[in-house]
Amino acid sequence: MSTRLIRLLHLYKKTNSRSFYTTPKLSDMFEYDKKSGYPFKSDYLEEPKTVLERIREGYSQLKHELWLFKEEVKDSLHMDPIMILRPGEVDVVWKFDGNPETLDNWVISTDRDYHDGRSYATLELTPSGSGLFSGVLDTVALKDGKKRQTGYCNIKTVEPRKSFYRSDVHDWNGYTHLIMRVRGDGRTYMINLHLKAFFDVMWTDLHHFALYTRGGPYWQYVKIPFSKFFFSNRGRIQDRQFSPRRNSVVGLGITAADGIAGPFSLEIDFIGVECDETFAEESAYELYHPPHPYYV
């Protein structure tokens, strides 16, 4: 009986079949690194210091942290939160006003920093005081057998924090739009919203939307609803979409990675948020899920 059953199984065996493409399986049940294996730039750019130099640096940091703590106490005693969001009024969050210290609020990263490509970028102030994000995209992959696609440059804001290195967030609850005043080169850039992650599986969550620039000498006023941002994890757009949690924003990034090799240039005046009371859209994407018990 068993021999006959085996023969029948061989008769019904499928040949020349193609399996579904699947992503590599996870080797762990948890994420041990917030950067998914990519090192922080400070991990290998920090210069070696002596014990005396570290003591001096720690003393200067202590003075700055005490000043931050004093400002926090003042704000808590004033108890003056934003109670009314005026329609049409833009609350500027990041502004390039010609002060070189504004560049310290941004971190530049390229594929060259992680030995994944040859692109490079800079962020500097223009003679008029605005910020200029420029560089060269190189889409030729390195011949190391590891990467097939390359060519990206990115800038990201430094995560807000309180005194003594306590984490903080940008509370944009009540705002409906992201406002930018930029002057581009005709390329398409990607805006990335980074949210505070509570669990390790959420460390690679991002919300994106495209930034279309016209090029030319004129400034461009960009108004993007938060409901237009789509959700992704590890660079893959997810089936289940939801609007970003506007009370948990920890950073904003701008990425140049449109696949076109050559120089790029994006001039930024300011980035802010606005409340539009006439806008009531919750999400621009389908939120319906079939009522199937095994739907994931």
Labelled PLM ranges:
Residues 2-296:
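Beta-rich carbohydrate-recognition modules and glycan-binding surfaces
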